[in-house]
Structure formats: C-alpha cells, structure tokens
Amino acid sequence: MKQSHFFAHLSRLKLINRWPLMRNVRTENVSEHSLQVAMVAHALAAIKNRKFGGNVNAERIALLAMYHDASEVLTGDLPTPVKYFNSQIAQEYKAIEKIAQQKLVDMVPEELRDIFAPLIDEHAYSDEEKSLVKQADALCAYLKCLEELAAGNNEFLLAKTRLEATLAARRSQEMDYFMEVFVPSFHLSLDEISQDSPL
C-alpha cells in the first residue's frame, strides 16, 4: 500500500497560530480553533433544526467545520487585514486556498478520496452549509475576542467591533439563539459557571 502524508499534514495545524499580528494572552492554534468551530457549527445546525424548522445534517456541518481551515496547513494563517486588503488580494488568496485544498485532497488514498474531498473543498458545500460554517467561524473569533478582553488585553477591542459587524451581516435565528443562551457565560469566571453544577 502507498503511504499518505494527509494526516501527518493535518497534525501540523496545531503548529499554526491564529491572530499572528496580535498580542495574545493565550495563543490559539488552527487545530483547536477548528474543533471549537465544529462544536459551534453543530450547535447552530441543531438549533436551526430543533427550534426554527431547519432540515440540515448537523453531523455533516460539524465535519465541514472541522476541515474548514485545513488548507492553512499549506498556506499558513494569513492575517485578516492582509487577506482582505483589497479585492485583488482576496481573489488571489482564494485561488491559493483552492490549490492548497486540491493538494490535500490529492494526498488522500484514491479509495477514500470521495469521502474527504467534499469535506476539504469548500466548493462542494451547499450555500446553507457554507453559511452555518461561516457563522460558527465568526462566532468563535468573537468568543476569542471576549476571552482576551476579559483577561485585560485591549488589543482585541477593534477586532471585537469588526466581528460584531460580521456577525450582524451573517445574522440568523440560530445565531441569535446561540448569542442569547450560550455567549453570556463567556463573560463569567470559572467559579461563576460552576456554582450551579458542582462535582
């Protein structure tokens, strides 16, 4: 059998730090970000289905979110101000991402490629799937800002404001529910979130 470097590459996502131009109280890597996005995207899909009459595959949404930044193992995490400096740079970066996604897909053994390709290639996502993953991605970046600000790091003030605008642009009923039910706890200490359910 031919060896594949696919998972060896994905394992290196933990070596790529997010927010590279910002001073962080706690550094966040792409691997842990992807897990959080998967959990939040799954929740958004479940909320959409249970509360607002949606009919999306929540487990697939979680998988798409797990792999949504996989190409960054080849491209790195380009800072947002650079990535979106102008439309030409944004367009070129999208083309680079597409090449990186295809390179990852090509690493997967041929007999498994049809399973992994639709998870890695964002062009295979439906509009609804893409929307839920993007909502979760923005929500997790917003939560990171809240955590940094709570730790006294004002470096994230402008990022929080920018992300509030992004969340407003991507607003949905399931996001409103998540913001109302789950986000307030991110402003609390461990003691405060633990007092109702001590071990």
Swiss-Prot record:
<feature type="binding site">
    <location>
        <position position="69"/>
    </location>
    <ligand>
        <name>substrate</name>
    </ligand>
</feature>
<dbReference type="InterPro" id="IPR022971">
    <property type="entry name" value="YfbR"/>
</dbReference>
<dbReference type="InterPro" id="IPR039356">
    <property type="entry name" value="YfbR/HDDC2"/>
</dbReference>
<feature type="binding site">
    <location>
        <position position="33"/>
    </location>
    <ligand>
        <name>a divalent metal cation</name>
    </ligand>
</feature>
<dbReference type="GO" id="GO:0002953">
    <property type="term" value="F:5'-deoxynucleotidase activity"/>
</dbReference>
<feature type="domain" description="HD">
    <location>
        <begin position="30"/>
        <end position="142"/>
    </location>
</feature>
<comment type="function">
    <text>Catalyzes the strictly specific dephosphorylation of 2'-deoxyribonucleoside 5'-monophosphates.</text>
</comment>
<dbReference type="InterPro" id="IPR003607">
    <property type="entry name" value="HD/PDEase_dom"/>
</dbReference>
<comment type="subunit">
    <text>Homodimer.</text>
</comment>
<dbReference type="InterPro" id="IPR006674">
    <property type="entry name" value="HD_domain"/>
</dbReference>
<dbReference type="Pfam" id="PF12917">
    <property type="entry name" value="YfbR-like"/>
</dbReference>
<dbReference type="GO" id="GO:0000166">
    <property type="term" value="F:nucleotide binding"/>
</dbReference>
<feature type="binding site">
    <location>
        <begin position="77"/>
        <end position="80"/>
    </location>
    <ligand>
        <name>substrate</name>
    </ligand>
</feature>
<keyword id="KW-0963">Cytoplasm</keyword>
<dbReference type="GO" id="GO:0005737">
    <property type="term" value="C:cytoplasm"/>
</dbReference>
<keyword id="KW-0378">Hydrolase</keyword>
<comment type="similarity">
    <text>Belongs to the 5DNU family.</text>
</comment>
<dbReference type="GO" id="GO:0046872">
    <property type="term" value="F:metal ion binding"/>
</dbReference>
<feature type="site" description="Appears to be important in orienting the phosphate for catalysis">
    <location>
        <position position="18"/>
    </location>
</feature>
<feature type="binding site">
    <location>
        <position position="33"/>
    </location>
    <ligand>
        <name>substrate</name>
    </ligand>
</feature>
<protein>
    <recommendedName>
        <fullName>5'-deoxynucleotidase YfbR</fullName>
        <ecNumber>3.1.3.89</ecNumber>
    </recommendedName>
</protein>
<feature type="binding site">
    <location>
        <begin position="18"/>
        <end position="19"/>
    </location>
    <ligand>
        <name>substrate</name>
    </ligand>
</feature>
<feature type="binding site">
    <location>
        <position position="69"/>
    </location>
    <ligand>
        <name>a divalent metal cation</name>
    </ligand>
</feature>
<keyword id="KW-0479">Metal-binding</keyword>
<feature type="binding site">
    <location>
        <position position="137"/>
    </location>
    <ligand>
        <name>substrate</name>
    </ligand>
</feature>
<feature type="binding site">
    <location>
        <position position="68"/>
    </location>
    <ligand>
        <name>a divalent metal cation</name>
    </ligand>
</feature>
<keyword id="KW-0547">Nucleotide-binding</keyword>
<feature type="binding site">
    <location>
        <position position="137"/>
    </location>
    <ligand>
        <name>a divalent metal cation</name>
    </ligand>
</feature>
